[in-house]
Amino acid sequence: MAVGKNKGLSKGGKKGLKKKIVDPFTRKDWYDIKAPSMFTTRQVGKTLVNRTQGTKIASEGLKGRVVEVSLADLQSDADAERSFRKFRLIVEDVQNRSVLCNFHGMDLTTDKLRSMVKKWQTLIEAHVDVKTTDGYLLRIFCIGFTQKDQMSTRKTSYAQHSQVRNIRRKMVSIVTDEITKCDLKGVVTKLVPDAIAKDIEKACQGIYPLHDVYIRKVKVLKKPRFELSKLLELHGDGGSKTGEVGETGSKVDRPEGYEPPVQETV
């Protein structure tokens, strides 16, 4: 056994007792998340980031963050048809204490997808890569199910392989025609009411009746070069003002001379 002094005991205490505990949230700032002007609710939440310190800039830490918001929250609507559709928004620029987001994708919730898959029917899926007029390359996934004839006594509603191919071909052609004629803002405007899926359901009635037709997923594969002017145009006035149109709130009645209490900690 080696003989020597125990430095930890000679100092009269354990290591780390005199170290000050610093709350990490004191070094962070809150930023408002602003959605594009295509949605009713513009302020969808807040996000945290460390303050600018040395070479680490706060705005650089915010750019590229992706948030996922339900369409019901974006449209301030409790409609069940919108609650299962999720939109992804990506932070592209920072203006004062607001982060400006752009469309980054769409998806359906897992429980909605699982609830639609049932026995005695045919599931039909299709996907296609299309480019918008402003240079965004999108991959669109579509899903639909065959519908049982109410007048028929058959238990099943299976479609033939030729009918499935024709329906899939019709899905691809309608999605391509709708997306290639508009820019990204127009695509989001069509995705909010799910107008493309309704057109597909109507066009496929002559081949085989469908139900539960949805645009299942939208992925952004490629983007054009970032331009701040286009992002500000997408947000209307840029979202840098605190009292921006679309921020909802309620007025609180307070007595005259009311002053908020002084907080002990921040």
Curated annotation (Swiss-Prot):
InterPro entries: Ribosomal_eS1, Ribosomal_eS1_CS, Ribosomal_eS1_euk. SMART domains: Ribosomal_S3Ae (SM01397). One of its GO terms (cellular component) is cytosolic small ribosomal subunit. GO terms for molecular function: structural constituent of ribosome. It is found in: Cytoplasm. Keywords: Cytoplasm, Ribonucleoprotein, Ribosomal protein. It comes from the Eukaryota. Residues 237-266 are annotated as: Disordered. It holds the Pfam family Ribosomal_S3Ae. GO terms for biological process: translation. Component of the small ribosomal subunit. Mature ribosomes consist of a small (40S) and a large (60S) subunit. The 40S subunit contains about 33 different proteins and 1 molecule of RNA (18S). The 60S subunit contains about 49 different proteins and 3 molecules of RNA (28S, 5.8S and 5S). PANTHER family: 40S RIBOSOMAL PROTEIN S3A (PTHR11830). HAMAP family: Ribosomal_eS1_euk. Belongs to the eukaryotic ribosomal protein eS1 family. This is Small ribosomal subunit protein eS1. It comes from Lysiphlebus testaceipes.
